[in-house]
Amino acid sequence: WIMGHMVNAIEQVDEFLNLGANAIEFDIDFDENGIAKYTHHGIPCDCGRLCTKSAVFTEYLDYVRQVTSPGDPKFRKELVLLALDLKLQRISSEKAYAAGVDVATKLLDHYWKRGWNGGRAYILLNIPLVEDYEFIKGFKDTLRKEGHEQYNAKVGINFTGNEDLDEIRKVLEKLGEDEHIWQADGITSCFPRGTDRLEKALEKRDTPGYKYISKVYAWTLVRSSIMRRSLRLDVDGVMSNYPDRVVGVLQEKEFANKFRLATYADNPWEKFMRI
């Protein structure tokens, strides 16, 4: 999965897809009551990027629904995963449950259309810190109460704050979640980062019987050398400001026969086992 990073303006969706992304990450900004208002990152953000691009969240969902709905004039088959970077650290953790309710409701109304010609992409809920776990409860409770638990099959969970992997597992156990789990590791492109935690996550992913990590990706990679380093470790995905650079690295002799771009036919919740 090549994940376009910080794709917060509607016009950026096709821009990043044209550069080779098959997944996009966008930031969800909440008001003080946990209502999802805008796709917006804000200052500071990655070096060399404009931090202030934004859209109304529901309008953004309406657009990506069209882009991921077969038969729609705007359909792009390559877009298979939407990663919602939930800026919950900006609101009280007491509002995390309400935020989960609101995001689930808006996805039902504007993306899935409650079963009427909705978008098909998989959804990854990027949660900054384990203390915000109530978001997941609010989200799942809403799907159940609204009679649309079928969409759980399309939804995954990812804690993105580089916290202790065993602490993340404990929270997932507490929630009763042991599938559809991704693990991110990374830092803003402005700073270097080693691979210790990334390698630990990959080791857990590859441990037979370990349920709490099915995919691992590294973020935010801008240098080709760091992309190569991550690919050599066998990551499942790379988040980048420059998807075209990732495409270029994947075409190199070392990687061309080892990796391919994920398509809609690839289940993002299953571990990929090399033969």
UniProtKB/Swiss-Prot annotation:
Known role: Dermonecrotic toxins cleave the phosphodiester linkage between the phosphate and headgroup of certain phospholipids (sphingolipid and lysolipid substrates), forming an alcohol (often choline) and a cyclic phosphate. This toxin acts on sphingomyelin (SM). It may also act on ceramide phosphoethanolamine (CPE), lysophosphatidylcholine (LPC) and lysophosphatidylethanolamine (LPE), but not on lysophosphatidylserine (LPS), and lysophosphatidylglycerol (LPG). It acts by transphosphatidylation, releasing exclusively cyclic phosphate products as second products.
Reaction(s) this enzyme catalyzes, per UniProt: an N-(acyl)-sphingosylphosphocholine = an N-(acyl)-sphingosyl-1,3-cyclic phosphate + choline; an N-(acyl)-sphingosylphosphoethanolamine = an N-(acyl)-sphingosyl-1,3-cyclic phosphate + ethanolamine; a 1-acyl-sn-glycero-3-phosphocholine = a 1-acyl-sn-glycero-2,3-cyclic phosphate + choline; a 1-acyl-sn-glycero-3-phosphoethanolamine = a 1-acyl-sn-glycero-2,3-cyclic phosphate + ethanolamine
GO biological process terms, semicolon-separated: killing of cells of another organism; lipid catabolic process
Cofactor binding, note field: Binds 1 Mg(2+) ion per subunit.
InterPro entries, A to Z: PLC-like_Pdiesterase_TIM-brl
EC number: 4.6.1.-
Binding site for Mg(2+): 25, 27, 85
Subcellular location: Secreted
Protein name: Dermonecrotic toxin SpaSicTox-betaIIA3
Catalytic residue list: 5, 41
UniProt entry tagged with the keyword Magnesium: yes
Family recorded in the similarity comment: Belongs to the arthropod phospholipase D family. Class II subfamily.
Native organism: Sicarius patagonicus (Six-eyed sand spider)
Keyword terms, alphabetized: Cytolysis, Dermonecrotic toxin, Disulfide bond, Hemolysis, Lipid degradation, Lipid metabolism, Lyase, Magnesium, Metal-binding, Secreted, Toxin
Domain of life: Eukaryota
Disulfide bonds: 45-51, 47-190
One GO MF term attached to the UniProt entry: toxin activity
Tissue: Expressed by the venom gland.
One Gene Ontology cellular component annotation held by this UniProt entry: extracellular region
UniProt keyword Repeat present: no
Class of the enzyme per the UniProt entry, highest EC level: lyase
Cofactor(s) required, per the database record: Mg(2+)
